[in-house]
From Swiss-Prot:
Alphabetized InterPro entries for the sequence: Peptide_deformylase, Peptide_deformylase_sf
Gene Ontology MF terms in the entry: metal ion binding; peptide deformylase activity
Keyword Iron: yes
Entry protein name: Peptide deformylase
Binding site for Fe cation: 94, 136, 140
Note on cofactor: Binds 1 Fe(2+) ion.
Enzyme class: hydrolase
Reactions this protein catalyses: N-terminal N-formyl-L-methionyl-[peptide] + H2O = N-terminal L-methionyl-[peptide] + formate
Pfam families with a match to the protein in the record: Pep_deformylase
Active site feature: 137
Organism: Desulfotalea psychrophila (strain LSv54 / DSM 12343)
tRNA-binding keyword on record: no
Required co-factors: Fe(2+)
The enzyme's E.C. designation: 3.5.1.88
Amino acid sequence: MAILKICTYPDPVLRKETVAITVFDEKLVKLTEDMAETMYDAPGIGLAAPQIGESLKLVVVSTARREDSKQEYMVMANPEIVEKEESQVDEEGCLSVPELLAMVKRYRKIKVNYQDINGEPCSMTVEDRFAVVLQHEIDHLNGILFLDHLSSLKRNLYKKKVKKWFLPR
């Protein structure tokens, strides 16, 4: 397994359209293992393929119950939210949007159709924090960053901060 480079805002790969996974092979297994290792190393609780420069409809999410527990994760290929209920506001951060935490409004309960690592169709209904994580990661597959859910004022403040990081000293 390998730790991959995480792409950060404003890298254009984060906005690219992703393509569906159609081949479920050892290469995909290796990619998801590397993604999981990268996610836990960061540390994070979810990672989408665009965040490591791959324009694929693929996410890995931690299923560990506590931070100190075994590194368990699930793979979701071609995930799609098919049902959503209620809303909630929760604090989010993103490995691709460093140094920013913000309150974001998301659905409280969602149903997601996806394929597992073997290409088998699956469906899952989740709520609360896990629903937030899945919505966040699925947004990445559509070129949407959690930054896009913020007010224009907060977005612009963050953009100014990022520009300063790249100015010559």
